[in-house]
Amino acid sequence: AIVLMAIVIFIYRDWIFDYVVTGPINPDFISYRFLCQFSHWAHLGETLCMPPVEVNMQSNTFGGQFLGSISMALIGGIIVAFPFIFWQFWLFVKPALKENESKNTRYVIFWVSFFFFLGAAFGYFLLGPFTFNFLAGFQLGSRGTIRTLPTLSDYIDNLTNIILGCGLAFELPVLAHILTRVGIISPSFLRSTRKYAVVVILIVAAFITPSPDWMSQLIVFTPLFLLYELSILVSDRVHKKTEKESEEWS
C-alpha cells in the first residue's frame, strides 16, 4: 500500500508539490484566507491576517530535486496508507490479547486512524502555516543582511515533522484509553495534572504563533486543550467500565 501510494504521488509530483506540499507557504493558502476573513468578521481587524512571506527554496546538489521527489512520495505514501500500516501492526498484536481485551478494542483501527488524520490536518492547515510564517519572517539583526534560503529537503523534513508529530500527538485519547485499561493512569491523575498541562500547552502555543496577540495563541491552544479534556473523559469512561467488570468477577 505504501509503495502503491508513493508511485501515485510520484506520478503527480508536480501538482502535489505546487498545491499540497508548498501550500502552507503559499500566501493564497486556504488557512491564511480563512483566518483573515474570520478576523474581519470578528471585528479584530488584521489581528489574524498573517503577513505574506517569500520563501525561495534551493537545491544545492544535482540530484536534490529528484531525491526530494522520492522523499515526498514515500512520506506521502506513509501518511495516506497509515490505516493499512496500523492494521498490519494490529494483526500482529491482537493474538496476544485476551478475549475480553480484544472485544473492547473492536473499533481501534478506526479511532487510531481518525485521530491521526485529525492531527495531521491540524498540523497541515494550522500549525504548519503558523510555523513557516513565523520562521520565514523572523529576522536576526536590523540591517537585513541575513536571508533565509531553506533547502528542499529542509522544508520537506520540517513539514513531515509537523504533520507526523501532530498526527501522533492527537493519539492522546487513544493512549489514555490504553493506559487506563492496563492501570497505569487514572482519570484522577489526569485531572490533578491538568494545571501543568495547561501551562505546557500555553507555552507551546505562545512559541509557535507568529504574533504575541492572545487571539492567535488561543486558536492553537484550544484544540490542544480540548484534546487533553477528551483524554480525561475517555479515561474516566474506561476506568468506570474496568471497575464494573472487576465487581462482576469478584
Regions found by a protein language model. Give the residues of each.
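Membrane topogenic/interface segments and analogous intrinsically disordered interaction regions
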Residues: 1-250
